[in-house]
Amino acid sequence: MDENKKKALEAALGQIEKQFGKGSIMRMGDKGAIRDIDSVSTGSLGLDVALGIGGLPRGRVVEIYGPESSGKTTLTLHAIAEMQKMGGTAAFVDAEHALDPIYAEKLGVDIDNLLVSQPDTGEQALEITDSLVRSGAVDIVIVDSVAALTPKAEIEGDMGDSHMGLQARLMSQALRKLTANIKRTNTLVIFINQIRMKIGVMFGNPETTTGGNALKFYSSVRLDIRRIGAIKKGDEILGNETRVKVVKNKVSPPFKQVEFEILYGQGISREGEVIDLGVKEKLIEKAGAWYSYQGQKIGQGKDNVRQFLKDNPDIYETLQVQIKERLMPKPNAPKATDEALDETGTD
């Protein structure tokens, strides 16, 4: 670049910083420019691996959607617990008015320090979310759920009144305001969403999510969570087998999927994941129903091995570290760009 262009560029950069503040524009090589994306664990080792960066990206919008009782809130509560372990502050905007503090505590959430809001309208919920994000003091905000963000006009109107597109407009406007603040404050904002059926779809997937298309575009990560089976002990059902598909990922290659167990009253079975991934990576040997570790039998059947790992936390931690070393991305590994990894018509 010749000297005149350099001077013109420096003058323009100086003018921008003077008008909009320091850090409003910078070179990617400058100290303080964000290149590596911070992440927070989902509480599931397999899902952290599938996401490619070791968890959910901070400073981004994430959407988690699925049918009823599929594990959406459980997954977000695990993410809150992991953020609190890192010393972060968490907020839960409970538009559904259905948060169970006893269950949250069982999953490891510090409920005494969890900020909770139960707003009356969708506008109020999104204004509260925006205020929390702009404060820069909250590390993770959960909105549960998009379907429950009822516009004020609908609440104040009569039953049977038509309010076509109100919720979609509300979400679109809110996300335009939120996105820049989310990036600037490095806050992770997770929207939980529900599934609806499109009427008259003959071919293709009739499923869609509520709240219009804005959230699909603004989300850096979209997770589709489904219950695929039950975990039984005799006739008693202990939990659900769950599958999560990464349907959109702007920070790593998408379309990976992972399966794990959610146990009632306990949340994601970390020991179960360590067993499955340990067998896959040949750290645990499996012969018939018997499992062995370093040549020694550790149990017959998955339930017994799960209990063995609970009773022997040292072995559990060793296995977890070995699995992470093998499967987690290395810090200097090349990362894909947002443009290359944007969604390719999966909605």
UniProtKB/Swiss-Prot annotation:
Biological function: Can catalyze the hydrolysis of ATP in the presence of single-stranded DNA, the ATP-dependent uptake of single-stranded DNA by duplex DNA, and the ATP-dependent hybridization of homologous single-stranded DNAs. It interacts with LexA causing its activation and leading to its autocatalytic cleavage.
GO molecular function, one term: ATP hydrolysis activity
Keyword Isomerase part of the UniProt annotation: no
Similarity field: Belongs to the RecA family.
Subcellular compartments: Cytoplasm
GO cellular component term of the entry, any: cytosol
Keywords for this protein: ATP-binding, Cytoplasm, DNA damage, DNA recombination, DNA repair, DNA-binding, Nucleotide-binding, SOS response
Region described as Disordered: 328-347
Origin species: Hydrogenovibrio crunogenus (strain DSM 25203 / XCL-2) (Thiomicrospira crunogena)
GO annotation terms (biological process): DNA recombination; DNA repair; SOS response
Protein's UniProt name: Protein RecA
Binding site for ATP: G66, P67, E68, S69, S70, G71, K72, T73
Pfam families named in the record: RecA (PF00154), RecA_C (PF21096)
Keyword DNA repair applies: yes
